[in-house]
């Protein structure tokens, strides 16, 4: 069955006939979607590149904002709005930046990435929690790519290694409604964990070479 609703609140880069800066749904419709989903115990994620759609989604009480690229009429990452940020913070909305490992080629040579990093810093200072994600399914981004994406995400978002790890585990589990059963190693939880030949709190690159994977306490993959 369905356990989460995702709405394309704005246009996308690979969606024919759409523009990332244009809102596809107004706040009233998004609020109706959120209210209906909540009646069925479901969370709602909203694809939002532009500030107009981010504002509508935040006002509607969306659970997670995917991308949150702050696209304005002046360009990508140039539509940052402190009032919209305050709304995101007030609503307790999680932000999922969808930074994959391919972004590594932009680090240090992209005004957009520099602007975006500054925006994420402002968001974190305001108390917004960022969760690790990759937008898997788009061209050249596979569903198992998070381990190589996490160091890139940490660099762009200004996260320490331990903060990046939380964004992919305990924080992420909480954001998608699994905080009571997964995302941590503790009594009563699902016992999903990975062993590495190294300390990922010191070096996130070790995530790309797991030694052993356990699911619900049982080994499922050996290197």
Label every PLM stretch briefly.
Residues 6, 66-69, 165, 195, ...:
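Residues embedded in well-ordered beta-strands within globular domains across many folds
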Residues 1, 5, 37, 47, ...:
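Divalent metal-coordination and catalytic microenvironments
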Residues 8-118, 126, 131, 137-138, ...:
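Active-site core of metal-dependent hydrolases
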Residues 170, 187-223:
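C-terminal cap of metal-dependent C-N hydrolases
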Residues 114-199:
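His/Asp/Glu-enriched, well-ordered alpha-helical/loop segment
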Residues 78, 143-147, 207:
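Conserved strand-to-helix beginnings and helix N-cap segments that scaffold or border functional pockets
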């Amino acid at each position: 069955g369905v356990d989460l609703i995702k709405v394309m609140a704005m246009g996308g880069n690979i969606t024919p006939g759409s523009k990332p800066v244009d809102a596809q749904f107004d706040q009233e419709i998004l609020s109706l979607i959120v209210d209906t989903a909540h009646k069925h115990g479901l969370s709602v994620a909203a694809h939002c590149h532009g500030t107009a759609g981010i504002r509508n989604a935040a006002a509607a009480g969306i659970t997670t904002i995917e991308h949150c690229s702050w696209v304005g009429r002046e360009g990508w990452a140039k539509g940052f709005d402190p009032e919209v940020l305050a709304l995101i913070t007030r609503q307790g909305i999680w932000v999922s930046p969808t930074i994959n490992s391919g972004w590594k080629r932009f680090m240090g040579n992209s005004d957009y990435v520099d602007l975006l990093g500054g925006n994420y810093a402002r968001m974190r200072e305001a108390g917004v929690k960022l969760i690790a994600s990759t937008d898997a399914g788009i061209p050249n981004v596979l569903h198992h790519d998070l381990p190589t994406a996490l160091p890139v995400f940490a660099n762009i978002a200004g996260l320490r290694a331990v903060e990046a790890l939380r964004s992919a585990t305990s924080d992420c589990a909480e954001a998608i409604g699994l905080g009571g059963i997964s995302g941590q190693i503790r009594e009563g939880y699902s016992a999903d964990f990975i062993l590495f030949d190294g300390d990922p709190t010191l070096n996130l690159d070790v995530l790309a070479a797991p030694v052993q994977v356990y699911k619900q306490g049982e080994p499922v993959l050996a290197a």
